[in-house]
């Protein structure tokens, strides 16, 4: 019984303590909360008063600005009037000075010393007096013409419409249309003559031809001194507009468009009517698009235009690329998932730090640069040889590696800056693309005199690369093969090898000595040339990926699945050279083993990119690899 009473008392004491704890401090806290609300109310009231005061000040400033604009207009008109008055006054002053000079000469030449004027002097003075009004009128007439030209060409003039021009044969000048005036009505494109005769001289052509020409009319007027007839000769010629190089290349046409093919005269490929991405996507990792309604305006990556509020847009779940529904087929491929973080120092990490864990393992900056270069750079002379602006390259690199969204490379005017960005990224990696460990293997494979053994050794070295390096190298080689096949760039395999040799091959150690650097500089281009000589089918296999865990309703596939440029056939099989007993006597002992290794790496049972799926998917069938349902 005592134990029960003791337990009940303990429970009662605990309840009392808890009630005291709960009752303590509540009033103080509520009072403090009320005081805080009162402080915020007062601040809100003060802010409201200040807002009203600033609105009044803004209205006063707008009124003052309007008044000052009116005053400025009147001041400009007054300045024009004063300029004309000054010109007339200067002309009158010059005339009076000439008359005074004539009178001075007349008086100084008089040697008689007589105070009275002779008859000749009186007649001369009378002539000057009579000729003054006529000369003044003539001078005013000439000056009025000069004033008209001056008012039209004056930079300080307020009225600059120039919409009405009076045709005057006395105005002789050669005038070329400015860029601003080309966009106005056609009636203003004729300056030195009526528009009627000029229109007859123009040949009837397409709208494109008319839009690329301007009319320049030259009129020469000859006025004889003896009062003979006045002769006028007019010539009319068409001059093409000056265009920037970016407008020639920035048409945003894909690589496999018909118009681009006709101009480049490349090897034949599959023709399609739909617009595709700059490279094929057969077997590539495709975008996993989801539709959303735009709340905050965003920019479409393929076309660069803004997607306005309330419009429907598509966004990839992996790489966060945003596009219009009609631009989905032009999004860059392959789809590279966006990284959560970047290395501490921009651009100075390992290549694996810039790629995701899904295949193909290619840095996003490489994919976007290559796609933009192939869209509008394959007609640019000296691609990758001409350097871009260092400041632009640095800013783009910051945006790619620091900002979560993808910067719009289509808004970069200089395509060489994008090329420099790609080279700068690959050059500033802590380890080159071909790695320090395999540097010597690649150089030794490139220097093998026998072509079959050299290619087999190159296959072996590529197969030993880390997956990120191998995938990036394959993507880059496919791109450089396209650049080499374009005749407009004037960058063949040898030139590209000289440019990319130090960038992707580099050296076997981080800080080589000068002697090693000189030796490697001669060997690096050979490695790139040998890599570019490998067939396109070999590099394309690394771009193929099994589409796992992707909703088929979201898959958007390009119809141009097999439209990449064809690489010329080489003289060696992918599985190594065909040998005979006599031929094997001339080979090195390692050639057969290298060929056997290449043969084993190219079998169809080899897993691609370390796929996590348990069942192998047949990627060797013909046609498209994935279904292409339309997005609803």
UniProtKB/Swiss-Prot annotation:
GO terms for biological process: actomyosin contractile ring assembly; erythrocyte differentiation; mitotic cytokinesis; mitotic spindle midzone assembly; monoatomic ion transport; neuroblast proliferation; positive regulation of cytokinesis; regulation of attachment of spindle microtubules to kinetochore. GO terms for cellular component: acrosomal vesicle; centralspindlin complex; cleavage furrow; cytoplasmic side of plasma membrane; cytosol; extracellular exosome; Flemming body; microtubule. Induction: Expression is down-regulated during macrophage differention of HL-60 cells. The record marks 385 as: Arginine finger. CDD domains: C1_MgcRacGAP, RhoGAP_MgcRacGAP. InterPro entries: C1-like_sf (IPR046349), PE/DAG-bd (IPR002219), Rho_GTPase_activation_prot (IPR008936), RhoGAP_dom (IPR000198). It is found in: Nucleus; Cytoplasm; Cytoplasm, Cytoskeleton, Spindle; Cytoplasmic vesicle, Secretory vesicle, Acrosome. This is Rac GTPase-activating protein 1. The lineage of its organism: Eukaryota, Metazoa, Chordata, Craniata, Vertebrata. The gene is RACGAP1.
């Amino acid at each position: 019984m005592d134990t029960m009473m003791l337990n009940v008392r303990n429970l009662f004491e605990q309840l009392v303590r808890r009630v005291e704890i709960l009752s303590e401090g509540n009033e103080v806290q509520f009072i403090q909360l009320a005081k805080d609300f009162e402080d915020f109310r007062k601040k809100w009231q003060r802010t409201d008063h200040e807002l009203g005061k600033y609105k009044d000040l803004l209205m006063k400033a707008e009124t003052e600005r309007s008044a000052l604009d009116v005053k400025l207009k009147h001041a400009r008109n007054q300045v024009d009037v004063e300029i004309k008055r000054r010109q007339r006054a200067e002309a009158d002053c010059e005339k009076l000075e000439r008359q005074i000079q004539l009178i001075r000469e007349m008086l100084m030449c008089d040697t008689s010393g007589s105070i009275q004027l002779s008859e000749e002097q009186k007649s001369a003075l009378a002539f000057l007096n009579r000729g003054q009004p006529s000369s003044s009128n003539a001078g005013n007439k000439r000056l009025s013409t000069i004033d008209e030209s001056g008012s039209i060409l004056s930079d300080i003039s307020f009225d600059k419409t120039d919409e009405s021009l009076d045709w005057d044969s006395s105005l002789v000048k050669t005038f070329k249309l400015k860029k601003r005036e080309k966009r106005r009505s056609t009636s203003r494109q004729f300056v030195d003559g009526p528009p009627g005769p000029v229109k007859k001289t123009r040949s009837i052509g397409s709208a494109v031809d008319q839009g690329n020409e301007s009319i320049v009319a030259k009129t020469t007027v000859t006025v004889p001194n003896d009062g003979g007839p006045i002769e006028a000769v007019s010539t009319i010629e068409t001059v093409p507009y000056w265009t920037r190089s970016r407008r020639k290349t920035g048409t945003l046409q894909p690589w496999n468009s018909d118009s681009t093919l006709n101009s480049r005269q490349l090897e034949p490929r599959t023709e399609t009517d739909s617009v595709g991405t700059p490279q094929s996507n057969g077997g590539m990792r495709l975008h996993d698009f989801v539709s959303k309604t735009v709340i905050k305006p965003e920019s479409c990556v393929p076309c660069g235009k803004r997607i306005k509020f309330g419009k429907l847009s598509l966004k990839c779940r992996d790489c966060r690329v945003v596009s219009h529904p009609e631009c989905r087929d032009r999004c860059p491929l392959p789809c590279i998932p966006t990284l959560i973080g970047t290395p501490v120092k921009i651009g100075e990490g390992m290549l694996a730090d810039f790629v995701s864990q899904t295949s193909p393992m290619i840095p996003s900056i490489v994919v976007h640069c290559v796609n933009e270069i192939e869209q509008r750079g394959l007609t640019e002379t000296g691609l990758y040889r001409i350097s871009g602006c260092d400041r632009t390259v640095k800013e783009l690199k910051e945006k790619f590696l620091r900002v979560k969204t993808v910067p719009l490379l289509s808004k970069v005017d200089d395509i060489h800056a994008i090329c420099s960005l790609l080279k700068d990224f690959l050059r500033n990696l802590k380890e080159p693309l071909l790695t320090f460990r395999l540097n010597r293997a690649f150089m030794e494979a490139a220097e093998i005199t026998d072509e079959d053994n050299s290619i087999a050794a190159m296959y072996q070295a590529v197969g030993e690369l880390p997956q990120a390096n191998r995938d990036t190298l394959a993507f880059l080689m496919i791109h450089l093969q396209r650049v080499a096949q374009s005749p407009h760039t004037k960058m063949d395999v040898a030139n590209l090898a000289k440019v990319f040799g130090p960038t992707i091959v580099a050296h076997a150690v981080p800080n080589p000595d000068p002697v090693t650097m000189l030796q490697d500089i001669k060997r690096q281009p050979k490695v790139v040339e040998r890599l570019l000589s490998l067939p396109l089918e070999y590099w394309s296999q690394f771009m193929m990926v099994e589409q796992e865990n992707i909703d088929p309703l979201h898959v958007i596939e390009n119809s141009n699945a097999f439209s990449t440029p064809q690489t010329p056939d080489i003289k060696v099989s992918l599985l190594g050279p065909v040998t005979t007993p006599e031929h094997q006597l001339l080979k090195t002992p390692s050639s057969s083993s290298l060929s056997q290794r290449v043969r084993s790496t190219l079998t169809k049972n080899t897993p691609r990119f370390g796929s996590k799926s348990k069942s192998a998917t047949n990627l060797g069938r013909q046609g498209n690899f994935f279904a292409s349902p339309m997005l609803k």
